């Protein structure tokens, strides 16, 4: 704005030879520093990026019961997907509902997740081979365990500083883990 105002003043009080140059600058379209979304390389990526270096705190599972999980002091009801600094609801009912699409959130992140710990409820269940194949093709290891052991494994890997995710289904029935000072109602 200040530059344009300076050119206007210069244009009005110009000598004849400077006029053509200033006139051409004044009337030519200029985009300046503004970029359209197509010009910006970061706009063209198709991945989501949730990890940030400014927030180095990790996600830890405090407790779980048949209704859900307590993660960093916050209650999450039902199945959930844990990312290095984020928790999201996971829309699966049982291990049989787990598909490639339900795991897609784990391979969209950057930096890439090294390992995904899957908790399948009270006992360890097998996943479809296509799901495991898709994760292997993307370079992500999958560890399938019952939910109590998956919670412990996830906390251990986070404590080690590994870039890990978890896909957890709450164990049915009365199986529960409460951290000190919490009840398992």
UniProtKB/Swiss-Prot annotation:
One of its GO terms (biological process) is mitochondrial respiratory chain complex I assembly. It is found in: Mitochondrion inner membrane; Nucleus. It comes from the Eukaryota. Expressed in testis. Pfam families: DUF498. The keyword Mitochondrion applies. Keywords: Membrane, Mitochondrion, Mitochondrion inner membrane, Nucleus. CDD domains: Mth938_2P1-like. InterPro entries: MTH938-like_sf, NDUF3, NDUFAF3/AAMDC. Transmembrane segments: none annotated. One of its GO terms (cellular component) is mitochondrial inner membrane. Interacts with NDUFAF4, NDUFS2 and NDUFS3. Essential factor for the assembly of mitochondrial NADH:ubiquinone oxidoreductase complex (complex I). Belongs to the NDUFAF3 family. This is NADH dehydrogenase [ubiquinone] 1 alpha subcomplex assembly factor 3. It comes from Rattus norvegicus.
